[in-house]
Amino acid sequence: TKRIEKEMIQTIKNLLGIGPKTDYSELIKQGAIVLDVRSKGEFAGGHIKNAINIPVDQLSSSLTKLKDKNKCIVCCCASGMRSGTAKRILESNGYHAVYNAGSWYSLQSKL
């Protein structure tokens, strides 16, 4: 669909550093939740300090862990694909300030 194509293009632009930048460091300093949607095993192998781990395939059934739909959520994974899916899931469930930060490792280097 057009929406998925648009999200994929934006992910590629983000990875290449094209287009407007989001200051994830500032969002996190202001209290944004870092949501890592990789598997439990991937998360155990390394993650951003204080990140919440909810694998993307469990996100729809775990939304109660993210109670405040107005709280800023910065999603990350290994490459940006699963976090893009997580962003769409959260937005379709009424979350208002959701960002796809792409790779957790890249995000960590910006913090």
Q: What kind of region is each of these model predictions?
A:
Residues 76:
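Short, surface-exposed ligand- or partner-binding patches at beta-edge/loop junctions that are enriched
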Residues 5-32, 40-71, 81-111:
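Rhodanese-like catalytic fold shared by cysteine-dependent sulfurtransferases
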Residues 36:
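N-terminal glycine-rich beta->alpha transition that marks the start or flank
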